[in-house]
Amino acid sequence: MSSKFLILLAFCGATLVAAEQLPEKFYGTFDLDHSENFDEYLTAKGYGWFTRKLVTFATFKKVFAKNANKNLFDYSNLTSKKDVFYKNVQIGSKFEGEGLDNTKHEVTFTLKDGHLFEHHKPLEEGESKEETYEYYFDGDFLIQKMSFNNIEGRRFYKRLP
C-alpha cells in the first residue's frame, strides 16, 4: 500500500511542477484603444441594437496580475458598466465565475502557441452565449479576437504604464 501512495505522490508532484504559467508578457493593465468589426460580431451573435450600443460605448480595461502562487494569476475585466474579478486562476482549470451579463459561467483559460484563450460557457439562461476569446500581442497592442459564424471582431488594448 505504501508503494501505491508513493507513486500517487510522485504523480501529483509532477503534475504541480508541470502546471502551465501565464507568460510574463500578459501581466499588466491594458486599456481598450479601438475595435474592428465588433458591432458586426455582436450582431452575428444575435445581440439587439440596445445591448450592442451599451457594449460598444462602454470603457474596458483588462488586468492580469501576479499571484503569490506562481502557477496562478488574478484577472480583472473592468468596465464602465460592471467589473468582473477572477482570483487564483490556473491555466487549464475550469472554475465558476460571474460574467458581465450577471449570470454564472464556467470559465477556462488555456495557452496555445503563446496565445491565451478565455472560454466561457453560460450556466444560466440569458442572452449570453458560449464563446472563446483569444488574446495575443501585435506590436504594442494586446489583441482580443472573437468570432461567430465566420464573423470576426477584434479589440485592441494598450498597456498602461
From Swiss-Prot:
Alphabetized CDD domains for the sequence: FABP
Cellular compartments annotated: Secreted
InterPro entries the UniProt entry points to: Calycin, Fatty_acid-bd, Lbp1-4
Example of a GO MF term: lipid binding
GO cellular component terms listed in the entry, alphabetical order: extracellular region
Keywords: Lipid-binding, Secreted, Signal, Transport
UniProt-listed PROSITE patterns: FABP
Family: Belongs to the calycin superfamily. Fatty-acid binding protein (FABP) family.
Domain writeup: Forms a beta-barrel structure that accommodates hydrophobic ligands in its interior.
Entry function: May play a role in sequestering potentially toxic fatty acids and their peroxidation products, or it may be involved in the maintenance of the impermeable lipid layer of the eggshell.
Name of the featured protein: Fatty acid-binding protein homolog 2
The encoding gene: lbp-2
